[in-house]
Amino acid sequence: MSAGPLAGIRIVELGGIGPAPFCGMLLADLGAEVIRVDRPAETGKDSPHPVILRGRSSVAVNLKDTEGAALVRELIGRSDAVIEGFRPGVAERLGLGPDVLLAANPKLVYGRMTGWGQDGPLAQEPGHDINYIAVAGALHTMGPADGDPVPPLNLVGDFGGGGMLLALGLVSALLHARTSGVGQVVDAAMTDGTALLLAMTYGFLAKGGWQDRRGVNMLDGGAPFYAVYRCADDRHVAVGAIEPQFYAALLRVLDLVDDERFARQHDRANWALMKDELARLFATRTRDEWARAFDGQGACVSPVLSLNEAPEHPHNSARSTYRRGPHGGPEPSPAPRFTTTPPGEPAPAPCVGADTTEVLTTLAGLAPDDIDTLREKGIVG
């Protein structure tokens, strides 16, 4: 895209899955030119991730070949930033580490995305989102009081504490590079990012307002006024009536204003009884019946929508929170919104290697015959 607040910024993304390409998507959505380096063996294949890989170019280059690595160094030398998601030490072995690249391009911002970080006892260990949020302390907080921890998809480690944090770090370092002329390395670890997302929880813990066990606290489903309830049709509503005025509205709609069990909202000794009664009441109507009953009542009660339902909700539809992707299904629209520099529509995720010739011709200065020779050698795709 040419529009957006990051228009004019060029970023090279070194392959990868999950948080690193999510970071690339965020920056591409906001107008940055993102060039993704893929493996030549995948050349011509449809994008494996049609949403998260939208909005960028794809060049297919063999990073394990010295000529291929040299080509990528040339691209990065003409770029503002790089996104790298390998295990610590891999980029260095490929000749694509920050020392080499910053020596050639001192203003470069080098973003590193890992689970454990570049150092520490676990730095070389494999892992996934569930492992990172487990060690960071977040997974322990999620799930019922009488059950096991429940992983929140890979939203917390990979995306909230990973790719999104790296995007913030890259933009911050790019701003510094613009004003100082000095680049730097951004070490984004999913364990660090997940810990950061727990800032308010640790604040509650420090003040004695949080028990270090799940399902018994105000924000983890322990409170009857901040929980999910099953309805008559086996669908659910989410109740978030924390503040007194919202709690009062909840009781009013449910005809519980005069029920003594609900007179003291924060009496934890009574929470179990309150929760049982709310569960009984919500089970008497369907989800959509409750949604209509609470519409406009200011009680902070919402229907729990499925992935297919959410794009069709009137609010999401009015704000174009979701868009119809080129793959034919819904996908999230770029966010946040900008008044002066609104981004354009994201381009479809390219086939692997779709832009190899154009990028290498334009940025690396190669002639078409040179590129054909590299293809014959398997160095590019």
Task: Go through each PLM region and give its residues.
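Flexible, small-/acidic-enriched active-site or ligand-binding loops
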Residues: 2, 325-373
